Amino acid sequence: MCKKFVYGVAVSDYNFIGRERETKRLLDNFKGGINVILMSPRRLGKTSLVKHVCNKLDDKDIITVYLDIFGCKSEYDFYNKLTAEVLKQTASKSELWFEEAKEFLYRLTPKISFSPEPNSDFSISLGITPKTHTPEEVLQMAETIAIKRKKRIVICIDEFQQIGEMANSKQIQARLRTVWQHQKHVSYCLFGSKHHLMSTIFLHRSMPFFQFGDTISLNKIATEDWVKYIVSHFADGKRTISHALAEEICKFTENYSAYVQQLAWLVFTLKEEGETVTENDVKQAKNDLLATNDILFMQMIEPLSEFQLNFLRAIIAGVTKDFGLSE
């Protein structure tokens, strides 16, 4: 049974909405070997879009590789993650990926770490260090695999802003760009959740990744698309919501994809099959949404000084000028 609304994770198929133009543009770039930089504020569905495009890509001569580097804190953390995912996701048979890895990268000493949490996946470190492998050797591996397999590879790197937060970030970026820009059989889709850091990496002329590829700015999904989606998904769940109340969900969440899905779900759970959503239901769900996010909001403002908080209060109150003037 399909979930009617999904948030907090990447969505696909039934829960994926809109993005026809962006999907076509990404597909064309992937097929054409064009590098892509995907930028937007948080919670607009970048990861969902990229995974959606990877699933739609029907070219047997193209292999897509997806990796999330949020946990990478150093240059060689990134190299280990990149290498492991490229090797695993391009292997001819998944169970043979490590045996095949020896063909493309020597001196590997894998270490497997298990999480203490039940049902958690394990992580693999290939033992890549400055003493065992140069950056160029690691970064060129995907190109070597592509040539050997007679395929093209598209590597999609989520949370790419982590590169910008590493020590010696600009030098790392320069090393990546120097190798990647000369590859003929591998292209890259780079995206992340911190818009200001992504802008610094890709939009500043002084940075190595300036004009690295097709920069796509992801905008919010239109209200009319959301309303159709919400109304139809309520109907699929044998519940009824008016266009006006569906539009109110969009207005309250300002069309941020994750929050639209979350608020719609909270409203959905208030009704049983055969029932119709009321204004009071939407009002209650709004309060539930705010309460759910209270802890997150508190964590965000805890580090702020009283002066900074007063500054924010002034903006909320509509003050837009004369900041800093004494009476």
Positions of predicted regions on the chain:
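P-loop NTPase nucleotide-binding core
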Residues: 34-35, 39-44, 48-155
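A short, basic N-terminal segment
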Residues: 1-36, 41, 111
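Conserved Walker B catalytic segment
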Residues: 125-194, 203
